[in-house]
């Protein structure tokens, strides 16, 4: 027993050293503390209830919200009630909504047992289903998908509660004449991934989702084009800069995982070069740019041996690009110039760009954690970086955890960027509903510009706490201004929080295991001190 305990002590010391290394010099100087990942998990799932559009259910826990968008799609003769508002406004953008659901589903696929152990399985499934129920409505024909409800220009002119909306609820679709392979591909990915999640608890629903996913993928692949070329109104808000080829690969990989059918993997292998899957060396992962996610999913098939021998060579190329992303986050790519590695703030935060940088942090944390787990399944699991350096699974996992801890308050400002968590967090989130008196408390109509006049410019905290939201976060120097007008830093988005559902669940399990190990190790330290 004593020998086992001493080994555990050594393992804990090694883990602490890896965490210090992963956080960088600035983060090492920041005081580290234990975080309540279970509390963070519970709060993160509450956020999705605050973002609901449509008729709210009786078990709605975010009491300051009420029904909204109840006539969405009416002018077009289609029922588009439901879904999620993406951020602090009231447009329903299909591409980021679908990516949110994909990442929620991936969280559950990898760490669903951990979510269930924390007692949050039901809430997580509800969060996914609120999105997929909407996608079923929006996919009205095999080759037709409603991709947006509302207009960003008129919406941003007003500052209203969603319950008071007077802005346009025009709906926009993609179809054979106006293709949108990116939004259709991402929605296919979301529904395929969600079908895996619901396979045990609701097999009929899982089959329905898979049916829609397969139809949407066929539509996206057969009628190719960027959705922002078909829907001009989306260009100023969610332009598809990366194009649609990454979404086609992404959707095919999720359909392969959901069905096990070889032709989906053949598609990923056959189009690896021409679609950029084995060509693009990427250092970001987001609602727009899916290549790193594609490469990591493809590498998983290689690491776990879930492929035919004829696929090996191409999957090895995918793995090389996946490890470029991982090494870029670690700062280990010796070749490729300044853009080959992700910048770090003095406090250790991965920094990609000024506007809503936290989306890149949270998505990176998830990809790193998942890849570390995939590496752990391989006897020779290690990351090979450009220039000859290597990194083990433990180091990759430690960086993922360091990014999560930064979000939760282990940073130079000591602020949690997860709203409602800890003693210090943003109080003036750029969010219309949260910043105005709740509709249930005051049903007096608030007009389009009244919100700007009476609520937007207030220096006081928001009357409603947007629990579980992850705001845009600090700049490259770890600086942050908690001001409603500072939308680049204080606006939260659903796709910021979605990957953290899985991360909080995983880290909650790890923290529990560490406490158990510490309890075993403590007597051994005492015994060693007496020798």
UniProtKB/Swiss-Prot annotation:
The active site is at residues 89, 430, 482, 491. Pfam families: Glyco_hydro_9. Its EC number is 3.2.1.4. GO terms for biological process: cell wall organization; cellulose catabolic process. One of its GO terms (molecular function) is cellulase activity. Belongs to the glycosyl hydrolase 9 (cellulase E) family. This is Endoglucanase 7. It comes from Oryza sativa subsp. japonica. The gene is GLU10.
């Amino acid at each position: 027993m004593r020998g086992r305990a001493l080994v555990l002590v050594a393992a804990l010391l090694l883990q602490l050293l890896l965490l210090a290394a992963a956080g960088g010099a600035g983060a090492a100087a920041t005081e580290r503390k234990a975080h309540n990942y279970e509390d963070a998990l519970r709060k993160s799932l509450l956020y999705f209830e605050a973002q609901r559009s449509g008729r709210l259910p009786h078990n709605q826990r975010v009491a300051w919200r009420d029904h909204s968008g109840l006539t969405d799609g009416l002018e077009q003769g289609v029922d588009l009630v439901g879904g999620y508002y993406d951020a602090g406004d009231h447009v329903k953008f299909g591409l980021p909504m679908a990516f949110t659901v994909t990442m929620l589903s991936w969280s559950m696929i990898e760490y669903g047992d951990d979510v269930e152990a924390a007692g949050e399985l039901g809430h997580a499934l509800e969060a996914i289903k609120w999105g997929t129920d909407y996608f079923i409505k929006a996919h009205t024909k095999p080759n037709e998908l409603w991709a947006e409800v509302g207009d960003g220009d008129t919406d941003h002119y007003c500052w209203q509660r969603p319950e008071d909306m007077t802005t346009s609820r025009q709906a926009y679709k993609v179809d054979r004449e106006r293709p949108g392979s990116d939004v259709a591909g991402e929605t296919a990915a979301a529904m395929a991934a969600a079908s895996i999640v619901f396979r045990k608890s609701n097999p009929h629903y899982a089959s329905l989702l898979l049916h829609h996913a397969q139809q949407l993928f066929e539509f996206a692949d057969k009628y190719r084009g960027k959705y922002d070329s078909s829907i001009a109104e989306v260009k100023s808000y969610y332009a598809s800069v990366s194009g649609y080829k990454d979404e086609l690969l992404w959707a095919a990989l999720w359909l392969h995982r959901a069905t096990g059918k070889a032709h989906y993997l053949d598609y990923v292998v056959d189009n690896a070069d021409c679609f950029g899957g084995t060509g693009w060396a990427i250092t970001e992962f987001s609602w727009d740019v899916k290549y790193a996610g594609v490469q990591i999913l493809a590498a998983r098939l290689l690491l776990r041996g879930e492929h035919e021998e004829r696929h090996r060579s191409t999957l090895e190329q995918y793995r090389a690009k996946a490890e470029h992303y991982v090494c870029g986050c670690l700062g280990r790519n010796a070749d490729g110039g300044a853009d080959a590695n992700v910048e770090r703030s003095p406090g250790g935060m991965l920094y990609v760009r000024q506007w809503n940088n936290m989306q890149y942090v949270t998505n990176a944390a998830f990809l790193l954690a998942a890849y570390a787990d995939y590496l752990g399944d391989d006897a020779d699991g290690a990351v090979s970086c450009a220039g000859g350096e290597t990194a083990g699974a433990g180091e990759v996992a430690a960086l993922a955890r360091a990014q999560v801890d930064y979000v939760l308050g282990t940073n130079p400002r000591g602020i949690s960027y997860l709203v409602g968590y800890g003693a210090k967090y943003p109080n003036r989130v750029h969010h219309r509903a949260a910043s105005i008196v709740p509709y249930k408390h005051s049903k007096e109509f608030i007009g389009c510009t009244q919100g700007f006049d009476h609520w937007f410019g207030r220096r006081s905290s928001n009357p409603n706490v947007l629990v579980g939201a992850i705001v845009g976060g600090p700049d490259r120097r770890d600086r942050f201004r908690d001001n409603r007008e500072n939308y680049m830093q204080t606006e939260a988005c659903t796709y910021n929080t979605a990957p953290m559902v899985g991360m909080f669940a995983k880290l909650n399990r790890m923290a529990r295991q560490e406490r158990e190990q510490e309890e075993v190790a403590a007597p051994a330290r005492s015994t060693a001190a007496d020798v």
